[in-house]
Amino acid sequence: MIDKFNLEISKGEFVAITGNSGSGKTTLLNIMGLLEKPNSGDIIINNIKNPNSKQIRILQRDFYGYLFQNYALIENENVENNLKIALKYQKNINHNEKINYALESVGLRKYNKKKIYELSGGEQQRVALARVILKECEVIFADEPTGNLDKKNRDIVFDILKSLNKNGKTIVFVTHDLELSEQADRVIKL
């Protein structure tokens, strides 16, 4: 349960949320990402107080990207089809060119025809990250994005997040990893 909580995150900030299991880290992230509504209180995003359902859809579609610990991919589809989902609302663009760019960005250039179930956990998380890159969102919410990964893949995924942040993206991530949280601009401890 999160009670009497006030938080302001500036554009381009890299924020870690840490705390014990059950402290509300994921709940806070989901409230900020408009995936859950708070029981009470206000949410103000880009000067919009308590966005209505239409505003929430626009924010989620156009401004927010989500990176979940469980990857949220369609396992029996190939990488390319999973990535096309992120391009659903982008018209008049070369989808293949954008997909190739996103896969190159995460080190999976030749993986577009591979089925998701053929990939390791680290590769699946990088596909999920490529999907976020394709959305060209302003804010990325990441819930334990490296929690299921070995050190090599953890470092790859985190380096990509840091690179996105250096290019102006706001990153808010939940982690139990002290080493990763220390690399954030700010750490919020619940």
Regions found by a protein language model. Give the residues of each.
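Helix-to-loop junction immediately C-terminal to a conserved catalytic motif
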Residues: 33
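Conserved ABC ATPase "signature" region
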Residues: 94-111
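Conserved ABC ATPase signature
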Residues: 115-119, 123
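Catalytic Walker B motif of ABC-type/P-loop ATPase nucleotide-binding domains
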Residues: 140-143
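Short coil-to-helix segment of the ABC ATPase nucleotide-binding domain corresponding to the Q-loop/switch region
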Residues: 77-84
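ABC ATPase NBD Q-loop/coupling interface
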Residues: 42-58
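Hydrophobic anchor residue at the start of the ABC signature
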Residues: 129
